[in-house]
Regions:
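Acidic, glycine-enriched active-site microenvironments
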Residues: 1-202
Length: 202
């Protein structure tokens, strides 16, 4: 079985065009370069990224989807959905849903991500970080959130100069200064979009 899995992984990797693999490697390197000044532990290589998104159904059923990218490539066998029903559905509360997902993820054990990317901003990141701290799991992985710029009313701000996504880290009030259209931001957006399509398609 292990030999078969290894062979399948090798075939899958060989099917990825070299240009795509090189582009992903370049983007990963740029992500790595963007983090050290803001995150002390970011000196370790970022190879495995887990990204999570929340989907609500009428506020009574909630799913949290997780996709995994390793060395810039999707690892579909590691994709997971967590269904939250009844009281655990969190009544459409993203913060509570993400906190519950983080509890379950920590209980499931390794392999750990090098970076956990949350589809959300400061509030969502803080909700997940609280569970990490309560579980004495700080240092297992980096944590970041990706979200659209917002106006004063909380709506996605699409004015000129504010159309891109923003990357937030725990303990920082301001987003990372990533340029719109940069390789690193496009790469993280692609992973977030993959998580979004995965969870709403379940």
């Amino acid at each position: 079985m292990a030999v078969s899995n290894a062979r399948e992984a090798a075939v899958t990797k060989s099917e990825v065009p070299m240009s795509d693999r090189l582009a992903a490697a370049f983007a990963l390197d740029k992500v790595q370069s963007a983090l050290p000044g803001a995150v002390p532990m970011a000196s370790r290589p970022i190879r495995r990224i887990e990204c999570v998104d929340v989907s609500h159904t009428g506020g009574t059923s909630t799913r949290v989807g997780m996709v995994v990218f390793e060395d810039g490539q999707p690892q579909k066998s590691d994709y997971r959905t967590h269904a939250l029903e009844g009281e655990a559905a969190c009544n459409g509360d993203d913060y509570a849903a993400l906190a519950e997902w983080m509890r379950r993820r920590l209980e499931s054990g390794p392999p750990w991500a090098d970076l956990v990317l949350i589809d959300g901003g400061r509030g969502q990141v803080s909700a997940v970080q609280r569970i990490v701290r309560e579980s004495n799991a700080e240092g297992l992985f980096l944590l970041a959130g990706i979200t659209k710029a917002r106006d004063d009313m909380g709506r996605a701000d699409r004015r000129a100069g504010n159309v891109g996504d923003r990357i937030f880290l725990p303990g920082r009030s301001n987003p990372l200064p990533l340029r719109d259209g940069s390789a690193e931001l496009l790469f993280l957006q692609h992973i977030r979009d993959t998580a979004h399509h995965f969870v709403i398609g379940r």
